[in-house]
Regions:
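Conserved GNAT-fold acetyl-CoA-binding loop/helix
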Residues: 15-45, 50
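A short, internal acetyl-CoA/4′-phosphopantetheine-binding micro-motif in the GNAT/acyltransferase core
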Residues: 74-85, 105-106
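Conserved catalytic-core motifs of GNAT/GCN5-like acyltransferases
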Residues: 104-106, 122-138
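Conserved GNAT acetyl-CoA-binding A-motif
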Residues: 96-109
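A short beta-loop-alpha structural element at the N-terminal edge
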Residues: 4-20
Length: 145
């Protein structure tokens, strides 16, 4: 049995719970338009999980982090209950053994920006039209030798 307080590597079978987390986040985030149904999110996650370092937390799952090793980039970090340490646990897990990580965050997501800044990330650049058409900010974290 896994420790629910320790992130574990996720699998395709976790896609439904993780898509639910994103869907609930979209529902309560006024600036984020819904572009995909929960079913479409599940399909996208099922296709993407095998190609990512994919961490989940909790049983049932309360958060996940998707990491692209080739780009050293966090592709998604979502938790059901922000502010209670789940995001930090996931982020700390993916930081292990790495000296550089980057990510894009929606410009309007200022609470995420505060979180990433507290965790040692620096704002690097602005992209006025991210992949979903919403302005984004790129963050970097690196260990300086």
């Amino acid at each position: 049995m896994n420790n629910p307080d320790e992130p574990r590597l996720g699998c395709v079978g976790d896609a439904s719970e993780c898509a639910g987390i994103i869907s609930r986040w979209i529902d309560v985030t006024t600036w984020m338009p819904r572009r995909h149904s929960t079913e479409e999110l599940i399909e996208m996650m099922e296709e993407g999980i095998p190609f990512r370092e994919f961490w989940v937390l909790g049983d049932p799952i309360i958060g996940y982090l998707s990491f692209n090793r080739e780009l050293s980039q966090i592709m998604g970090l979502y938790v059901d209950f922000p502010g209670f340490g789940a995001g930090k646990l996931l982020l700390d897990k993916v930081k292990r053994g790495k000296n550089f990580i980057q990510l894009w965050s929606h410009l309007a997501n200022t609470s995420a920006h505060r979180f990433y800044s507290r965790e040692g990330f620096s704002k690097m650049e602005l992209n006025q039209s991210g992949q979903d058409g919403i302005p984004e900010v790129r963050f970097e974290w690196k260990i300086i030798a």
